[in-house]
């Protein structure tokens, strides 16, 4: 075990061995936090597991973009009417933390954000993320949208076991189709 001490300026941290899943060190990793954009880890996982054809087309709409923009959420930059693929949405959700990409994935996978969030919460429980509850797929603040770094670590360790998901989250730059 390694001690973080005062060298880490953040209030919460966790370092996990990616191969074994063992916690190397942590700082307040069991505290309840608002996961914000870390939500998109679960969004991408659930969409990836729910949509068989990652090259299936999706038409972005202004109705998806506008409310997210008005709420001040980060966007990937897709335009209303733009024809993209589910794969583009996965990268758009993961890399620039695009809320419109995340919301579009929810629609593509389940037809509504509500149904998709139910699936996210079910998946969290299956992974053993017992201190996590999602209220949306974008990471927008909500008092009941919570997790812990321990739970996020469980999720990340699972994601990194999948080569395609590891590639998505490990990519530096992506150009849409």
What are these language model-derived features?
Residues 1-150, 159-160:
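Active-site-adjacent loops and short helices of periplasmic peptidoglycan-processing enzymes
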Residues 156-177:
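Extracytoplasmic
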């Amino acid at each position: 075990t390694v001690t973080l001490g005062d060298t880490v300026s953040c209030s919460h941290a966790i370092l996990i061995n990616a191969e074994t899943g063992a916690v190397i060190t942590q700082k307040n990793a069991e505290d309840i936090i608002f996961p914000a954009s870390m939500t998109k880890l679960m969004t991408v996982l659930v969409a990836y597991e729910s949509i068989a054809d990652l090259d299936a087309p999706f038409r972005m709409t202004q109705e998806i973009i506008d409310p997210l923009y008005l709420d001040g959420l980060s966007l990937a930059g897709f335009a209303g009417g733009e024809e993209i693929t589910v794969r583009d949405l996965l990268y758009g959700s993961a890399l620039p933390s695009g809320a419109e990409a995340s919301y579009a994935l929810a629609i593509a996978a389940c037809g509504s954000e509500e149904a998709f969030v139910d699936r996210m919460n079910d998946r969290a429980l299956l992974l053993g993320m017992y201190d996590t509850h999602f209220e949306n797929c974008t990471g927008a603040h909500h008092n009941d949208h919570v997790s812990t770094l321990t739970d996020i670590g469980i999720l990340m360790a699972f994601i990194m076991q999948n080569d395609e998901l590891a590639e998505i989250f490990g990519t530096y730059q992506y150009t849409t189709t």
